[in-house]
Amino acid sequence: MKNTYNLRSIAAKAISQVLDQGQSLSAVLPELQKNISDKDRALLQELCFGTLRVLPQLEWCIQQLMARPMTGKQRVFHYLIMVGLYQLIYTRIPPHAALAETVEGATVLKRPQLKGLINGVLRQFQRQQVELLERAVNNDSHYLHPSWLLARIKQAYPAQWQQILDANNQRPPMWLRVNRQHHSRSEYLELLTQADINAEPHPIYRDAVRLITPCAVNHLPGFELGWVTVQDASAQGCVDLLDPQNGEQILDLCAAPGGKTTHILEAAPKAHVLAVDIDEQRLSRVKENLQRLQLQAVVRVGDGRAPDTWCGDQQFDRILLDAPCSATGVIRRHPDIKWLRRDRDISELAQLQSEIIEAIWPKLKHGGVLVYATCSILPEENQQQIAAFLQRHPEAQLTETGTTAAPGKQNLPHPEDGDGFFYAKIIKK
């Protein structure tokens, strides 16, 4: 039966919602994917994520092919052309099919009179493709990052910035977290081998396994039974560092979507865990993850800057603060971050992080452990944040993660390793 929808027009609308309305792709896509097949769902995701990953290159190509950009109500057709270009450059979709479906998107978007224009631009690109892509390599669009972020990464990592950009521009690896309540990691690796799924263990993080080739979760042995969870290796490092113990009172702050909450309980099933997040909608994901893994935690809505409103005078043995951040370490998973973030956001986020860590510090027992973590690679949110905190609090002692002069541990994104992540483990003396 022929599909009644046009994927290219759906992708163009999704990209419009990201770039013109400031919505995240992860918020936009689920609604748009509701009535389409699993196979087409994967293609839609590829068209959206891929187009946003290489946006500057596609934008530059359009500038060479069109006298003036499409604006206002016609902007969505600008994105439709981008989706067409992405298919021609980066996918194995036969060019005639890519063109036909993209051009037909104009009819679905109720501007059939633009079909000729869109067809003409895409065919012109086909004729000039080799020359245009060679020229694109010689300008800043080649880096596929906004100029403000490129400048910050170069400044922070003068010797490594190129590798960071390369990692950001690649598809992310698929990491699993083995539930140690069901199997050891070596046992689960054997199950993967039996299922003809190639995988390897992480050299540092004890529950982490990388799939050599990503696959759908329904192909993973025991996924529905809670034997395994999809979670990046660097994110798993937070709980390894926290080292939760049975019987302890543990706070997971900024907990949604619940990956770290459930990891804490897999590591210490008799711990008493309070999971708190300011976003009530995202907390439903925490509950879903707890349910799938058959784990129990108290889940509450709350602002990290006002802990008295959600925990009263309760104190904790361990606190995991996965602070709100720029998410510049997970760009390869969420390429829309490059276009949703602004330079001014960084200082605002650093201020918010400072307010949260100050507010939550009194809730940690003496002798207790706080792990501060972000999925950022920017020093203002990480080393500088922790250096300032240690200066304000002589009773705070850094352990296992750097020195007072160079506080914390910074992971950078790597094609065969985890995302960009920062950790600081602090004991209250």
From Swiss-Prot:
Catalytic reaction list: cytidine(967) in 16S rRNA + S-adenosyl-L-methionine = 5-methylcytidine(967) in 16S rRNA + S-adenosyl-L-homocysteine + H(+)
EC number: 2.1.1.176
InterPro entries membership: MeTrfase_RsmB-F_NOP2_cat, MeTrfase_RsmB-F_NOP2_dom, NusB-like_sf, NusB_RsmB_TIM44, RCMT, rRNA_ssu_MeTfrase_B, rRNA_ssu_MeTfrase_B_ent, RsmB-like_ferredoxin
UniProt keyword list: Cytoplasm, Methyltransferase, RNA-binding, rRNA processing, S-adenosyl-L-methionine, Transferase
GO CC terms: cytosol
Active site: C375 (nucleophile)
Pfam families: Methyltr_RsmB-F, NusB, RsmF-B_ferredox
Binding-site positions, S-adenosyl-L-methionine: C254, A255, A256, P257, G258, G259, K260, D277, D303, D322
Subcellular location: Cytoplasm
UniProt GO MF annotations: RNA binding; rRNA (cytosine-C5-)-methyltransferase activity
GO biological process: regulation of DNA-templated transcription; rRNA base methylation
Top-level taxon of the source organism: Bacteria
Family: Belongs to the class I-like SAM-binding methyltransferase superfamily. RsmB/NOP family.
Summary of the function given for this chain in its UniProt record: Specifically methylates the cytosine at position 967 (m5C967) of 16S rRNA.
Protein name from the UniProt record: Ribosomal RNA small subunit methyltransferase B
